[in-house]
Structures are given as structure tokens and as C-alpha cells.
């Protein structure tokens, strides 16, 4: 009985609270699926889960813009470039959230490779830049993302993704730690 009540309590009070939008989901397909992106194999995998771009075989360049609630202050920009090579796939990405007085920027360099027909892995190095108005200095941090995907069947894939596993800090008066994000999905 206690276990059931605990489970119900956890499920009722689980809420997504984002203090930073650093690992935001890119691409209309992922957004239309309720931010599901960890097991998808598409162009925006360079932003969502680098392992998903391992099978990408065409050079691609893309941009997206999202105007949240019709407010320019909540706008979200994404851009990416994917370059497949013989031994894997490279990707470059950038994202920006905010406006001139407050914004979060993320620049990334990714590499993904298929180790077998069923196993794909990806790594992305990120440089984060935060601008808190002209009165404050810009804050910077470096981190990385890891992704893993496995095709269980032709129509079913399992994916795991982690952003900022080492819990990077912003050098400020209070040494703010950036969030660790873990995603898992089918």
C-alpha cells in the first residue's frame, strides 16, 4: 500500500521545470510528437540526440525559428549542418533562445557512428554562452552530450541521451551549476 501511494504521489507531482532551455528540442517533427526525439533518426538529431544522425547519408543544412506565444523575447532559433563521411557523420549546430537583454546560446560539434546495424552512438561537444544584459559580463561554459540508439526491429528503436553529465558550472558569484538532462525512449 505504501509503495502504491508513493508511486501515485510521484506521478501526480512530477512536473517538468526548466530553469534553462539548453537542451531544447529542435525540429517540427519532434515538437509535434510532444518533444519526443531520443529515438528518431532525422536531420535534427544533431540537436536532439547525436546518435540519430549516424545513418544520415546526405549533406544537409537547415534552420528553424519558433516564435513562442508571439513574443520576440521568447523566440528560439536553431541551425545545423550535417556532413556524412566514410567512417561516420559530423554535425555542427547552434541554437539561441531569448532576445538582446537576455539570451542563451549553444554551439556544438557532433560526431556519430553506427557500430553495427543495430547500435549507433554519438558525441557532441557544446560551448554555452549566456548574456544577462549589458550590465553583466557574459557567462560561458563547456559541456558535452552523449547519445545511444539501438534498432530493436525495423520499426522500433530504443534511445538514450544525456546532456551535461559532468554538471558544468558557470563561473559566477554563486558558481551556478547547469542542469543534467537524461532522456530515454522507444
Model-derived segments and their meaning:
Residues 4-14:
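Sec-dependent N-terminal signal peptides
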Residues 15-19:
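Bacterial Sec-dependent signal peptides at the C-terminal "C-region" and cleavage site
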Amino acid at each position: 500500500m505504501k509503495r502504491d501511494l508513493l508511486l501515485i504521489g510521484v506521478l501526480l507531482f512530477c512536473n517538468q521545470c526548466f530553469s534553462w532551455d539548453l537542451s531544447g528540442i529542435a525540429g517540427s517533427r519532434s515538437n509535434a510528437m510532444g518533444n519526443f526525439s531520443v529515438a528518431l533518426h532525422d536531420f535534427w538529431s544533431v540537436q536532439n540526440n547525436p546518435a540519430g544522425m549516424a545513418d544520415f547519408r546526405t549533406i544537409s543544412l537547415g534552420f528553424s525559428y519558433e516564435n513562442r506565444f508571439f513574443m520576440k523575447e521568447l523566440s528560439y532559433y536553431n541551425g545545423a549542418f550535417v556532413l556524412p563521411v566514410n567512417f561516420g557523420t559530423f554535425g555542427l549546430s547552434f541554437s539561441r533562445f531569448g532576445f538582446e537583454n537576455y539570451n542563451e546560446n549553444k554551439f556544438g560539434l557532433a560526431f556519430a557512428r553506427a557500430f553495427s546495424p543495430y547500435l549507433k552512438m554519438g558525441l557532441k561537444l557544446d560551448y554555452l554562452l549566456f548574456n544577462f544584459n549589458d550590465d553583466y559580463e557574459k557567462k560561458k561554459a563547456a559541456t558535452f552530450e552523449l547519445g545511444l540508439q539501438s534498432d530493436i526491429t525495423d520499426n522500433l528503436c530504443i534511445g538514450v541521451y544525456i546532456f551535461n553529465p559532468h554538471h558544468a558550472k558557470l563561473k559566477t558569484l554563486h558558481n551556478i551549476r547547469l542542469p543534467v538532462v537524461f532522456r530515454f525512449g522507444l
